[in-house]
Curated annotation (Swiss-Prot):
Signal peptide region: 1-22
Full protein name: Fucolectin-2
Function comment: Acts as a defensive agent. Recognizes blood group fucosylated oligosaccharides including A, B, H and Lewis B-type antigens. Does not recognize Lewis A antigen and has low affinity for monovalent haptens.
Protein keywords: Calcium, Disulfide bond, Lectin, Metal-binding, Secreted, Signal
Organism: Anguilla japonica
Family note: Belongs to the fucolectin family.
Binding residue positions for alpha-L-fucose: 75, 101, 108
Residues holding Ca(2+): 58, 61, 63, 72, 168-169
One family name in Pfam for this protein: F5_F8_type_C_2
Miscellaneous notes: Binds 1 calcium ion per monomer.
């Protein structure tokens, strides 16, 4: 428990040394994508011919390939579709990087909200918002910086309308002290 608290304090200290307009990692720290260690879920699984290549876990496979039919993207649809990663422990998160589907349908992600928190109440939709995805080009990879460091175990991408949500990669960025 003490080690986790010390790590959390180091993360917060590192985050506070960042300039508000800078995406640079401060000296003495490394940025790591902790989503690779997590477990992903989504509100619905695509059915039919492409069901086997649209799993939630495809969005945390470390592959930014944005062509859906290569099998590296998630796909969920319906009323208020959502995708979520359980990071399996609490982290102090500075930003989330998303790769949008590139072979078509880039506009479908517009209006999605990135939520971060420690609770699964209402499928994580009640957790605080890091950012909203207003417009994102097909195949674009973009980092969404939270207005302040956010503490959470669950990162949810939620589309508050009837539609389709494609995510080809989701990276959850955390700062750690660099090894000596």
């Amino acid at each position: 428990m003490k080690v986790k608290m010390i790590m959390l304090l180091f993360q917060i200290l590192a985050i506070l040394t960042l300039k508000s307009d800078s995406a640079d990692v401060p000296d003495g720290y490394i940025q790591e994508n902790v989503a690779l260690r997590g477990r992903a879920t989504q509100s619905a699984q695509l059915r039919g011919e492409h069901a086997g290549i649209s799993h939630a876990s495809n969005a945390i496979d470390g592959n930014r390939d944005s062509y859906f039919y290569h099998g590296s993207c998630s796909h969920t649809e319906g009323d208020n579709p959502l995708w979520r990663v359980d990071l399996l422990q609490v982290y102090t998160i500075t930003s989330v990087t998303i790769t949008n589907r590139g072979d078509c349908c880039g506009e479908r992600i517009s209006g999605a909200r990135i939520l971060i928190g420690k609770h699964l109440e209402n499928n994580g939709i009640n957790n605080p918002e890091c950012s909203t995805i207003n417009i994102m080009a097909a195949g674009e990879t973009r980092t969404f910086h939270c207005p302040q460091p956010m503490i959470g175990r669950y990162v949810t991408v939620y589309l508050p309308k009837t539609g389709t949500l494609h995510l080809c990669e989701v990276e959850v960025n955390v700062l750690f002290p660099a090894p000596c």
